């Protein structure tokens, strides 16, 4: 970290410094803003009635940030990395949205706190395992880490990260890990019952569950190879979209039958 902070920003001919810097800053800022609606022990910074929509909107904002971070340097590999993330997003976003909608439908609310409270009898992860698994894969994808680090692949000289240096590189790297942490924290109220648990206060259970999810995600990203983009896109549209669509229908039918 001290080395990155002390490094001079890279200057490229014809680079659009404004768009480049805007894209770099957008990624960590969007990650922090996404966490505002996550209840920690029953309390959220912003308890929005459309918290799930807010989280998803901040995640989609990252698309624009990374594309601008790839476009701004006016370099071929960086631009390829930016477009790779957009293509990756087009593959994972629809299954991810269906996974989010499944939890919201079961709780009959878009408020994240209401979704956590609706799981006192049984965690959504238990009877909606497809949505839970797809959501966790989506977290790795929008963090472009592990098997989904294709936008920053070695075959394109680190892609969207390749031309950044100094504080800009630090911001982008921080943004990736902030998104991973925010995604892990959001999984707790959506699928793991929030801060509910015996013997400990709600904030402690929220922290323990978040750390457990984060540890699992880090284990996966350290051990799985990069997924080829064409195979991932095909699998997402041919397999994940139908599966998550069926998963949405399960809570929808249960709600209608009440």
Question: What annotation goes with each model-predicted range?
Answer:
Residues 1-258:
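Alpha-helical transmembrane segments of multi-pass membrane proteins predominantly involved
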